[in-house]
Design a protein with these regions (language model features):
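TPR alpha-solenoid repeat register
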Residues: 98, 132, 166-168, 202, ...
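N-terminal leader/linker segments that initiate helical-solenoid repeat arrays
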Residues: 27-86, 90-92, 275-281
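Residue-level recognition of tetratricopeptide repeat
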Residues: 61, 95, 129, 163-165, ...
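Structural marker of alpha-solenoid helical repeat scaffolds
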Residues: 57, 91, 125-126, 159-161, ...
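Register position in tetratricopeptide repeats
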Residues: 74, 108-109, 142-143, 178, ...
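Canonical tetratricopeptide repeat
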Residues: 67, 101-104, 135, 169-171, ...
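Terminal, low-structured helical/coil segments at or just beyond the last alpha-helical repeat
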Residues: 32-53, 228-281
Length: 281
């Protein structure tokens, strides 16, 4: 497995995503975060975050449909989710979050044309919506449209009051890895780490980049942050630590990580590679 595939797998597993896109298991981000910012809110000053108490009855009914759609989406009941989206938009056509979720559903169904159209529609309705920018960028990245994805992540991370900045920087770094842009990936991941040093996906991917660059001592620092918690450690993170110690000619520590890998993730690809001594894969 190449580092590009391994880092993508790790980032999908580790990024906590809430709200609309929880079912994506990782890199997607909710544009709502409880923030219903479309027309229909009352009593809100410019620049305020709109909360549910600001909703009028029309928006509230649409939101209920949207929440149902999100639930069906997480259960992979995509046709039913789309039907709820249609009803939400029939109630309130200005609900950007519903259009965004429609894009995510079409993407999950493998309908790229409709997914992209929905993302474009959502951005035309709200060009600076950080969640939409992030999710559209990740969609493009997964389809190897790296040049188109990158500015969307930058724009998402730069939005004022954005709750997605660290995720957008992280996923931007992962996309840059997949594009072979290692120096740029290090910068994006380092910035994400500065903002959220507790995120294990950021630490793992940054360590992976540094390993690729041959900076093994620095790589060791970040991967230790991940493996220090048994709840965060994965077969991938323990294998990376094992490989780092092998490169540093530290067989005792290498074998300690290998033992953890064998005991906790027996039968995994990484455990098998350790048993075979294939540290360059």
């Amino acid at each position: 497995m190449t580092w590009r595939k391994a880092t993508a797998r790790m980032v999908w597993a580790c990024i906590a995503a809430g709200g609309l896109a929880a079912a994506l298991g990782g890199c997607a981000s909710s544009s709502s975060n409880g923030n219903w910012r479309q027309s229909g809110a009352q009593g809100v000053g410019k620049g305020d975050i709109v909360t549910q108490s600001d909703e009028n009855e029309v928006r509230k009914r649409a939101r209920i449909r949207l929440e149902l759609a999100s639930t069906y989406f997480t259960q992979a009941q995509y046709t039913t989710a789309l039907d709820e989206i249609k009803q939400a938009l029939a109630i309130d056509p200005t609900l950007v979050s519903a259009v965004e979720l429609r894009a995510l559903i079409y993407d999950a169904m493998g309908d790229q044309a409709r997914a992209e159209d929905a993302f474009k529609q959502a951005l035309s309705m709200e060009p600076n919506n950080a969640g939409v920018l992030h999710n559209y960028g990740w969609y493009l990245c997964r389809h190897k449209e790296f040049a188109r994805a990158d500015p969307l992540f930058v724009q998402a991370a730069n939005q004022p009051m954005s709750l997605t900045a660290t995720k957008s920087l992280l996923v931007r770094g992962v996309c840059q890895i997949q594009a072979g842009q290692w120096a740029e990936a290090e910068k994006s991941l380092a910035k994400s780490y500065e903002l959220d040093p507790a995120n294990p996906a950021t630490a793992y991917n940054l360590s992976a980049v540094l390993f690729h660059k041959g900076e093994f001592e620095r790589a060791r620092f970040y991967i230790r942050r991940v493996n220090a918690s048994s709840q965060q450690a994965t077969a991938e993170s323990l294998w990376l630590a094992t490989r780092i110690e092998h490169k540093l000619d530290n067989p005792t520590v290498r074998d300690e990580f290998g033992a953890q890998l064998r005991n906790r993730f027996a039968g995994s690809r990484e455990a098998n590679l350790f048993e075979l001594g294939r540290f360059d894969e």
